[in-house]
Amino acid sequence: MSKHNSVWVLDDDKSIRWVLEKSLSRSGLSTQCFENGEDLLHRLEKERPDAIISDIRMPGINGLDLLSTVHDQYPLLPVIIMTAHSDLDSAVSSYSRGAFEYLPKPFDI
């Protein structure tokens, strides 16, 4: 159901999606990018990646709500949360909802 070594990237910022897609592709990973959580959840009904990288603050469904939904339905699917608004509450919320990892922006690729 999933492509081998596939990572889905969710961020409302086009430049972040572009940078992550280029970097992950150079590492040999198949990458699919999404602008909003609704599209990602719809696609998740049909196929599964090996991991998801998601921003927290986005219009529509935010990254933490997406994380909760994914973790409830697919508890073994790793979700990495990234945010430019890094604080202790965001980190605790991410890990308590099942995040595999928490990345404060900016980060080195």
Predicted regions: what is each one?
Residues 5, 35-36, 62-65:
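Acidic catalytic/metal-coordinating carboxylates
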Residues 39-42, 64-76, 93-96:
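Short amphipathic alpha-helix used as the core "switch/output" element in two-component signaling
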Residues 14-32:
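Two-component/phosphorelay signaling modules centered on CheY-like receiver
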Residues 58:
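Receiver (REC) domain active-site loop signature in two-component systems and cognate sites
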Residues 103-105:
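A Lys-centered signature of the CheY-like receiver
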Residues 47-53:
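Active-site beta3 strand of CheY-like receiver
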